[in-house]
Amino acid sequence: MDPVRFPEIFHRLGGGGGGGGDLLGGGEADGLMRALCEGLRVGEEDCARFVLYGVAYWQGGRCPEWVAHITRCADLSCFATYLLTCHRSGGCEFTGGRVARDRLPSLRESVEVLQSLFLAFTLVIFKSMRVGVEAAGGAFRRMARDVHWNLLLTLGLDKAAPAFMAAAGLGEYSLPLVRCNNNMLNVLVGMKRKSRNHFQNDTPLSVPAPHLRLEPRCMFLREGRAEAPLSDHDLSFLKALRDGGRTVPCGNPFNAMVGALAFQSMAASRYVVLPNTTDIKSFTAHDLYSKIIGYNILCPFLSVPVHRGYRGGDGAGARLAVVCAECGYCLNLGKGKFSKVSFNPTHIFYCRDQKEKYLTTCASTGRIYCSFCGSCRIRTYPLKFTVGNRQYIRAVGASNCSIVVSDSATELDLVLPCLGDDCTQVLLRRVAVCDLFYLTELGPGLYCSRCLKPTS
């Protein structure tokens, strides 16, 4: 492969005309991208998909061979050897040919392959993110001057890509550009201790000083006292109150009303678009953000499919679990020291108030509230239910974070319904998560003593 001359490529793409706000030339860039992919023996569309979505794009399907290699190789030197071997033999999965082992490539050849590969990745980023000519020119200059290509050969893609982006002045982008995060818990860890000093009070309610509320003639003060100026101590005290009031998330009934209405609306909607946490500038929005996410992921249940049929599978006559819809705790679990999972103490959903009572009843109205979070949104769920033709049971834990169970060897104390026909009893079992799938098979594992007793 020919060595990559980044300044010449930039001028060839129309970057020498001084149009700083224009985008990099389209036709020339597409032609260069096509030539690079043909030289590397990789598919042009597959290269663009890999830069945009990563290997996750091919989940459930077979990814191209070069994608599997670049994600599997310990360092990019091995991947460069693979591409050069494909180039010499005239094929890989993209060309349909067999890969024949040949001599090891030289360092110069490996660097040229790596430069061509990252140049192709960069062109996809420029086109997808509509990068201007001035920014692209700076990136090309840094590629020729600041990127240590020999060092990148010794790194895997997960470390080489951020190092290349930082050296090329493209640190604001990542590889892949679009990251689908299936575990929101990693994003939310530490939000509880996030500094909120930058928050702004959108609708502050201020109470004016007494001498500013009414005209002097309408004030209940002696004549002449209304015009008395405030002392330096009074001014300092008022300033301190105003400064402290900007970061206090209470005292504004309008904000509380808007927050409650917004939460009710989002809870009733099928889809909700939430802002990035870095763009949130008010306490109301911040609390609403964490509240609606908690509403959707906090749950005490593990749903387990049943491998044998039972009558009453629609939940009729089954025991009910009473659950707070906002904090996700089961409110009729009972007292005891249960083995359970929990959030990290710095997590935003960590509940420090492990109270003895689960429910609080208002003496005036008789309304029932959750003693953990104070919400009155309480729901009931049957421990036996059916989805289509599949029967399920709900295993109820003592915490609200069933979503954090990721290890099949984790042991939990779970309340499970008896699988006896028309039986409404429940059982307390300490089981590992992996054993839950075997409890619903034939056997005495999920039957109460009454159902196990032989009938005479």
Curated annotation (Swiss-Prot):
The gene is 66. InterPro entries: UL49 (IPR004339). GO terms for biological process: viral process. It comes from Equine herpesvirus 2 (strain 86/87) (EHV-2). It comes from the Viruses. GO terms for cellular component: viral tegument. This is Uncharacterized gene 66 protein. Belongs to the herpesviridae UL49 family.
